[in-house]
Amino acid sequence: MPDGERHSRPPFPLLGGFALFIAVTAYLVIASMAKRSVPTFDPSPQVTASLDSAPRHDDTITVDATDSKRWQFVDFDRGGVVAPPDTVGWDVAVRRYHVIASDAIADLGVRRFEEVRDVPESEFVVNVVDDDTSNAAIRRWYKYSMVTHLLEPTGHAYAVRTRDARLAIVQILGYYCTGLRPGCLTLRYTYPFPVPGTAHRVAGNQ
């Protein structure tokens, strides 16, 4: 090959670098144009009233978990968020995107909330208590978009077992406050949940 022709071609590393630059630029353009639309919610007010018995709740609660250093507590009996020192009897605690239970949680997989009929006892997982307390059953309730950089629920339903052996069925609807501020974790739940044919059948529903 003549020397003139050899030197007229751009070196391969230069072509590769240019292609990478084009790919990165295209990704950034697509990311900037991506639809940043997820459900947003306003935090639910805290509740203080104590209940002697647990009426059936089918509701949603939005927990203001924007403080990354403090757990926020939900009491299904009272149907809302409770604050210290009035947290005796809490069922679920939330800190940012972390969720734990007072007793245990079972991942029921992707399903419509209304389709939950049974809860296998073997599926329940207790919290792991360490420097960053967590529960493996619900740890990956979200999927993260590399394009929008937002957390979105996976659509799983979860069974939460309370200290007094009642059950709540829970589904996470969102993670963002109004204005797309992270930390407003919103739970849809039904409680107490009767499970025919298991030890978790709620008294009064047998």
Q: For each predicted feature, which ranges?
A:
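Surface-exposed, beta-sheet-biased, low-hydrophobicity segments with strongly acidic/polar composition
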Residues: 2-206
